[in-house]
Amino acid sequence: MDKFNPKKEKTVKKRALKVLTEISPTPLFSMLFLLHISQIATYLSLSDKETLNITVKTKQGGTDTCAGRYVYMHNLPSRFNEDLIKSCEAYIELRNKCKYLINSGFGPRILEEDHNHTTRVLTIETGSWYYTNQFMLEVIFREKMRHYECLTNDSSLSSVVFVPFYAGFDVRRFWGYNVKLRDELGEDLAQWLRERPEWRKMYGRDHFFVTGRVGRDFRRVTDQDSDWGNKLMRLPEFENITMLSIETNSRSNEFAVPYPTYFHPKSRTEVKRWQRQVTMMQRRYLFSFVGANRPKMEESIRGEIIRQCLASQGRCKFLDCDTSSKDCSDPVKVVEVFQDSVFCLQPPGDTPTRRSTFDSILAGCIPVFFSVDSVYNQYKWYFPKDRTKYSVYIAEEGVKKGKVSIEKLLANVSEEKISRMRNEVEKIIPKIIYTKPGEVGPEKIEDAFEIAVARVLERVSLFKMTRI
């Protein structure tokens, strides 16, 4: 048998790169093409007696539409997911989240009788509006993956491996407990993954998981009980795994995906209908703020934002989340405020990002950011690179010192520019929602889930090319 010839493989790859330069393909095509060429190069470097075991699947006589898109989902022991939500009521820190687990993590459905004006605010007759909790993403994502059109039970066909670990529920249930308890399940999972044959393929670099918490919850620096969170993402195994979370620490293996909103449509037609409703809204307020003050946070600008809003003589709507009315937990009231506003203020809260950002965009309201970490440095897969197309940025420092009048600044934005920005915001809507699982064909939407999976596939393809 002839020996493997690396020089011959290198020559083939050089020719492939020349072809790619000449045809100027899209980035995704380039990655998949290079991967294919690398396989051919390896094949040519072997003797006639040694061939690759390549399986090409077809559908109804045509090419396989899932080629390069297959995902294998680990069948984890129930202690890593199902048991965590079955025992929800047993943990004080989780009890107020239990009611949101129904309907595949979307929560209870919003009904017409919940408000006398629900039908004016929401497209309620479609049955696609829910009381969705912002931390339910891992449950939602797992259910979506179960219906993913390119899910396979044959890991040899898969391009990536999904790990359906409910990391957020795990870290939350032991909030304030000792670090041994907080770290135990993550370390158990790391060992379980190491022992799987799928792990040895790329030692985790083709694995990913999703969490409904912020990234810092999984990067505890010390082993002091007083320190925050657990150390899941500091384990050697998880340094290779890609984590998708609602907010990242800008690490190379962390990527931000949208917070869940209240809207989970089934079809493209339904989304377009909602976009038309958003376009036709008559907006009474120049700007609005839905949130609470943060008096104990010295760096917070929320107090100044609330002061300016209340002083605007009716041009700003403030929905106070620091009261016992629970209005901010009511999707109808929250969405109604955003529908009535041209601009929606999105200052940082406990962390730089906010679920409110996505609720306001859903309502067609132009977001106003005060920190680059609220969206621009986070959700790069979902928003235009040019932030001026869809948002307004006001530096925190000027607001904090009282040097910036938010009202005057926003009032100076021309009607023409507002129209362009709103049009861009409405285009973003399908990208930041999580649709009902199972839709295929022309009515299928490239939602937040589909975009995330596609980007993970691209990322793993790049890893594979660098290993060749």
Swiss-Prot record:
Query: Which superkingdom is the protein from?
Result: Eukaryota
Q: Which family does it belong to?
A: Belongs to the glycosyltransferase 47 family.
Q: How does it sit in the membrane?
A: Single-pass type II membrane protein
Record Pfam families: Exostosin_GT47
Is the keyword Aminoacyl-tRNA synthetase in the record?
no
Residue positions with a glycan: 53, 116, 153, 240, 412
What enzyme class is recorded for this protein? transferase
One of the record's GO molecular function terms: glycosyltransferase activity
For side Lumenal, which residue ranges? 36-468
What is this protein's name? Answer: Probable xyloglucan galactosyltransferase GT13
